């Protein structure tokens, strides 16, 4: 990382009721002694054996044949990560050389392949959530996975659907998609399909309830935080996107660090055996997050199949598991199933034939063979992905698009490229080291970990980041555009109160909101950046603000300033950040992104704002009670009639769209019975849950002056539930003067609620509200869908 000033050293130090019950009581209020912290999550045993059904039948058959040739010691060896011979892998399972099984190499995947050179840095999860583009997301996953395959890596450790974004200040929210289960599920499922169609195992993470970084791991005699989630909330929010990814065929799921209802997630039998492997019919293997194992064979009995990165509890080669089999405390069939699930996933992706040799290096500081994994065909996907995650939320006085300005003034620490992106920080990146402080001398404000002040932010920090081959920073791209347009530029990237040429046609201000793994954010805005915006706006009547943000960033400190004419949430675009932004600023392409979360006016508008901290008598057992249930983000704002600054699903374009011709109907012969028909369990749950029950259709017309993409959104009011819930979206490109018909299919699951009493999804009889429009609060088309009668 290079030398750090004392302030940076401080920053570096800072870096260093049961699921079946009707609800969760506040845990701190019912504790009488520490025995409370045991048995809060109901036991579900035995761990189901791999079904081997449907599309997995062939892989399962091959795996059974191969595993049957292994000794018990060899089977156990497959289940434990290796601390030696990694050769650049972040994790590596055991191997069986005599049977030509080389082991499974795993690497992180948030922005692309981590801990290596000659790969691309892709738009982040939150950026793709803001794109609302399923097809683009698929191609991002496919092309990204192609780089993993070229490097000989078997498993991409992504996508992320947990954290779900419950806590706005959550440090890893940027790796996930959004705060809505439907949107998150659809975007993540497309990511899984893309990754696995390229022949790479997708590892969906983190299962489950991993909603804060603070106290995510045990420390000393203090346990990891317990996410206390009731049955209904679990199914309707947190489990929902996992079901979508399993339905898409996900071959791996990673269990999380936190405790779930006071049982560590990686040894929680209700979660792994009950929800994942039984209810969702998961065919693949469960791998622990790195260092998340806290039990011996009990974790295997609870459904864990692979421990990473190594384990003394299971033994270096799994010898403690074989000993447990020998003494009868672990069933031999369980160990065999663990090995079978691993090998079947390998076969399912076709990795047994012509899979590339490992193309990583154990050290990049010594001579090594270079393997360039970048495919030129990825370039348009990288650029489109970068563009479509930008969200324009304000544009007055025709501020945008820019039209060959004579003079632009550019301000803010986020405009240039960071001063460092070298081989030393490919292992565990902090947003390409943009977090290192600039020598900002004209302000006493402590910016702490709120911003990355050393250059433009293209990704958050931690294991989800990687080393980009280049960064197109906003200032770089603006200079190139200035050359083409003969525009003159002034710039100041360090001052909080810069001089401003009064003749500037526009003043562009660049700031960011940063977060990283291992810590949560200090807040949702920072005084330094807000002061900068207000100071520039006081001197420039056409101030355009771009924020590269990891998630929710409040703007009410300056959003109504009359001289702030345009505001863009740029999210985390990856390596093509500046190139993409300039195309949008100058109207080569229209903005098309939509917010995947709600921007409030105040922190207090969020019913859950901060992470949970230890309190009460038993501070060694931190509790986080998810007592808000399903009412998060826009669902809560709607229920309480809170006016947001910018609502979920909001985003402007350079044109105008008109919605018309809403129609809806129940599919003929579809079952609308209260309980779903009894069907087989497929990947993702009971087959009947995926049956299409109803269809909705609407027309979107481009009445403006520029071709652009619009995201048509369908919301449904399910009886006894939130006011409305997202249940469909389609992104369509519509030329000027033309129209597009958007069609939405509603499955039984989409229209159902989870019944704790029935332990089933149930379809209420009656009238369902239907809304279609451009955001969660701009819904010009309204109607009703009648289920089960008139």
Residue ranges and their predicted role:
Residues 765-769, 785-787:
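A short, solvent-exposed, low-complexity linear motif enriched for acidic/polar residues
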Residues 23-754, 760, 767-772, 776-777:
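Glycoside hydrolase catalytic-domain context in secreted enzymes
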């Amino acid at each position: 990382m290079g030398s750090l000033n004392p302030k940076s050293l401080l920053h570096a130090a800072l870096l260093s009721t049961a699921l079946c019950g009707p609800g969760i009581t506040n845990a701190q209020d019912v504790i009488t002694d520490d025995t409370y912290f045991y048995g809060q999550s109901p036991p579900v045993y035995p761990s189901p054996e791999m079904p081997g059904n449907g599309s997995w039948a062939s892989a399962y058959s091959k795996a059974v044949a191969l595993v049957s040739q292994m000794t018990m010691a060899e089977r156990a060896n497959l289940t434990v990560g290796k601390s030696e011979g990694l050769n650049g892998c972040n994790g590596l399972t055991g191997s069986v050389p005599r049977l030509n099984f080389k082991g499974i190499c795993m690497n992180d995947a948030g922005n692309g392949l981590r801990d290596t050179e000659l790969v691309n840095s892709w738009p982040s999860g939150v950026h793709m959530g803001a794109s609302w583009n399923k097809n683009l997301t698929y191609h991002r996953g496919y092309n990204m996975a192609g780089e993993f395959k070229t490097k000989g890596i078997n498993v991409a450790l992504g996508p992320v659907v947990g954290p779900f974004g419950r806590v706005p200040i959550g440090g890893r929210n940027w790796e996930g998609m959004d705060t809505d289960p439907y949107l998150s599920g659809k975007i993540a499922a497309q990511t899984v399909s893309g990754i696995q169609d390229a022949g790479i195992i997708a590892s969906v993470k983190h299962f489950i309830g991993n909603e804060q970084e603070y106290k995510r791991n045990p420390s000393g005699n203090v346990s990891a935080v317990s996410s206390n989630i009731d049955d209904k909330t679990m199914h309707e929010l947190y489990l929902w996107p996992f079901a979508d990814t399993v339905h898409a065929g996900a071959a791996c799921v990673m269990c999380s660090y936190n405790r779930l209802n006071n049982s560590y997630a990686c040894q929680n039998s209700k979660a792994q055996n009950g929800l994942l492997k039984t209810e969702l019919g998961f065919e693949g293997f469960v791998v622990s997050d790195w260092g998340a194992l806290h039990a011996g064979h009990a974790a295997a009995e609870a459904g864990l199949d692979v421990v990473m990165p190594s384990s003394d509890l299971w033994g270096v080669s799994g010898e403690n598991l074989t000993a447990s089999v020998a003494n009868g405390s672990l069933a031999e069939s369980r160990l065999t199933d663990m090995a079978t699930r691993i090998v079947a996933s390998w076969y399912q992706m076709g990795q047994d034939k012509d899979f590339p040799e490992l193309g990583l290096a154990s050290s990049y500081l010594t001579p090594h063979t270079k393997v360039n994994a970048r495919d030129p065909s990825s370039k348009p996907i990288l650029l489109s992905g970068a563009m479509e995650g930008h969200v324009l939320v304000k544009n007055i006085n025709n501020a945008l698009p820019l039209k060959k300005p004579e003079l632009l003034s550019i301000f803010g620490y986020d405009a240039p490229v960071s001063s460092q992106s070298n081989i030393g920080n490919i292992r565990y990146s902090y947003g390409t080291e943009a977090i290192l402080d600039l020598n900002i001398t004209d302000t006493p404000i402590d910016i702490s970990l709120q911003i990355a002040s050393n250059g433009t932010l293209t990704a958050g920090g931690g294991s989800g980041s990687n080393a980009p081959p280049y960064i197109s920073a906003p200032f770089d791209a603006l200079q190139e555009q200035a050359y083409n347009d003969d525009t003159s530029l002034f710039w100041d990237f360090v001052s909080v109160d810069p001089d401003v040429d009064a003749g500037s046609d526009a003043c562009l201000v660049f700031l960011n909101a940063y977060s990283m793994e291992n810590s949560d954010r200090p807040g949702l805005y920072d005084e330094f950046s807000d002061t900068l915006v207000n100071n520039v706006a006081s001197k420039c009547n056409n101030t355009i603000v771009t924020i590269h943000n990891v998630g929710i960033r409040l703007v009410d400190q300056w959003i109504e300033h009359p001289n702030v004419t345009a505001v863009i949430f740029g999210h985390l675009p990856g390596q093509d950040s500046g190139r993409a932004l300039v195309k949008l600023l100058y109207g080569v392409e229209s903005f098309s992104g939509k917010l995947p979360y709600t921007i409030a006016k105040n922190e207090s508008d969020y019913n859950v704002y901060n992470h949970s901290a230890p309190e009460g008598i038993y501070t060694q057992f931190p509790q986080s009670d998810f007592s808000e249930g399903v009412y998060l983000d826009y669902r809560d704002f709607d229920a309480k009639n809170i006016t947001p600054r910018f609502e979920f699903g909001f985003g402007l374009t350079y044109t105008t769209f008109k919605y018309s011709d809403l129609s809806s109907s129940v599919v003929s012969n579809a079952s609308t019975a209260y309980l779903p028909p009894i069907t087989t369990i497929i990947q993702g749950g009971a087959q009947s849950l995926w049956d299409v029950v109803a269809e909705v259709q609407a027309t979107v017309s481009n009445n403006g002056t520029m071709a652009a993409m619009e995201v048509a959104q369908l919301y449904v009011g399910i009886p006894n539930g939130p006011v409305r819930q997202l249940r469909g979206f389609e992104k369509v490109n519509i030329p000027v003067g033309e129209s597009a018909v958007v069609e939405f299919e509603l499955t039984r699951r989409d229209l159902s609620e989870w019944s704790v009493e029935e332990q089933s999804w149930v379809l209420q009889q009656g009238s369902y509200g239907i809304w279609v429009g451009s955001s969660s609060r701009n819904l010009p088309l309204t109607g009703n869908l009648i289920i089960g009668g008139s």
